[in-house]
Amino acid sequence: MIIKVMTLFPEMFSGPLGNSIIQRAQENRILHIQCVNIRDYAENKHKKVDDYPFGGGPGMVMTPQPIVSCYESIVKEFQDKNHVEQPKVIYLSPKGKKFDQEMAERLSEENALILLCGHYEGIDQRVIDEIVTDEISIGDYVLTGGEIPAMVLIDAVARLIPGVLSQDASFEEESFYSGLLEYPQYTRPRVFRGRSVPDVLTSGNHSKIQEWRRNQSLELTFHRRPDLLKDFILTKKDQLFLEQIKSKK
């Protein structure tokens, strides 16, 4: 997959994208990420990329010309190198659709993505109307710009691309992939400061271990994210276990 990030602050990405899983995916040429500085495409003398909003109001708004010129340069590169002619253009915005695991799975099937990071009070609406295919939000809170949301999206999507993780099971058992929160994890030592690993995990009985993990996931989800259970298909054993949990309240 190829991901192009349109941003005013490309240096923000070097740390998060230059380590761990994302770094290895790029070294193995499974993933190619390039941050493109929008300011480089400003046609005015001082490389100015923002201006006061029409109608008044606080803050500054990113002007359309540098963003659209940056986008057109990226699209031309895709076309010249026989990549995707029209990749999705995702604007990271608090007004966008809430990002979740299902969306990450869909995006991981794309060959290329262009991510647009806003700043200041946002970007000129005409840019959104002209080039943006999707607006995505990572949550109901305010951030300084779209760079951190872009990193979140890249990390969530990249780990779903075949070959990025060493084992598919690594993400299939994680929180949200199955629809439930992940069960607690334990490693050595068996006892730490008086706290022991649950006996079932050292029993060698794999069916009991699976049952324990399933029940732990159900209980955690019930207490912390009950909204996830509304659309989750429960087995009869799941339903019985949850009834027992409810009776303890």
Swiss-Prot record:
Q: Please indicate if the UniProt record lists Cell wall biogenesis/degradation as a keyword.
A: no
The UniProt keywords, alphabetically, are: Cytoplasm, Methyltransferase, S-adenosyl-L-methionine, Transferase, tRNA processing
Localization recorded for this chain is: Cytoplasm
Swiss-Prot/TrEMBL catalytic activity: guanosine(37) in tRNA + S-adenosyl-L-methionine = N(1)-methylguanosine(37) in tRNA + S-adenosyl-L-homocysteine + H(+)
| Chain positions recorded as S-adenosyl-L-methionine binding sites | 118, 138-143
* EC assignment: 2.1.1.228
Q: Name one GO molecular function term.
A: tRNA (guanine(37)-N1)-methyltransferase activity
**Family, similarity comment:** Belongs to the RNA methyltransferase TrmD family.
Q: What exactly does this protein do? A: Specifically methylates guanosine-37 in various tRNAs.
Q: What is this protein called?
A: tRNA (guanine-N(1)-)-methyltransferase
Source organism: Alkaliphilus oremlandii (strain OhILAs) (Clostridium oremlandii (strain OhILAs))
Annotated gene: trmD
